């Protein structure tokens, strides 16, 4: 990751279970306090750096046209479906905490922030802040980590950064008709007026299983 690009990820949950990781240049570090991360990201944006913010929770859901499609997993999720009990819990925390972080960034930033979900536009410099989804499955979790929530955020951020280094970040889930909750938060806090992204999926990054 270059000095002008910041990759961060948040493992959402109850306040005592939040963890985050942030990478910029050769520096990286994490923590448990969301407000600390907000302060760092505001400083990054004010310094002209781009921020790619990953949320370890479902940030969009399918938008089926028939009842037979309701409550179905997204293609590629496997046993980590958004509609399973753990997925719906993470979705709820993710919606609230994504909105909290984006609203705090918008409120404290010294300039307007161009937010969105289009990773190609972000890499081309058209966005200041990108929201992406982290899908950390059981095999990618470090069970021996002293801070497992920070460790989950770290493995997600590192995988996104690895893909950025190749110049292309592809999603590990298939697309389709969706309702994007992260996009709703981006619009709600004034980072964009582009309503078409409400119907578009974010890029989803699934770190590989640990060796």
Predicted region positions:
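RNase H-like (RuvC/DEDD) metal-dependent nuclease/polynucleotide-processing core
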Residues: 1-211
């Amino acid at each position: 990751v270059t000095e002008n690009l910041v990759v961060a990820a948040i493992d959402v949950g109850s306040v005592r279970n939040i963890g985050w990781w942030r990478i910029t240049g050769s520096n990286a570090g994490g923590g448990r306090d969301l407000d600390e991360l907000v302060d760092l990201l505001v400083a990054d944006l004010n310094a002209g750096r781009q921020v790619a913010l990953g949320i370890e929770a479902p940030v969009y859901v399918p938008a089926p046209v028939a009842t037979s499609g309701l409550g179905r997993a997204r293609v590629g999720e496997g046993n980590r479906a958004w509609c399973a009990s753990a997925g719906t819990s993470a979705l709820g925390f993710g919606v609230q905490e994504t909105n909290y972080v984006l609203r705090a960034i918008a409120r404290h930033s010294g300039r307007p922030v161009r937010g969105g979900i289009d990773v190609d536009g972000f890499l081309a410099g058209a966005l200041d802040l990108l929201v992406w989804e982290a899908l950390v499955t059981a095999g990618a979790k470090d069970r021996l980590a002293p801070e497992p929530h920070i460790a989950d955020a770290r493995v997600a951020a590192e995988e996104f950064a690895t893909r950025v280094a190749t110049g292309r970040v592809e999603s590990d889930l298939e697309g389709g008709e969706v309702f994007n909750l992260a996009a709703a938060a981006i619009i709600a806090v004034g980072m964009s007026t582009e309503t078409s992204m409400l119907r578009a999926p974010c890029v989803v990054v699934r770190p590989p299983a640990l060796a």
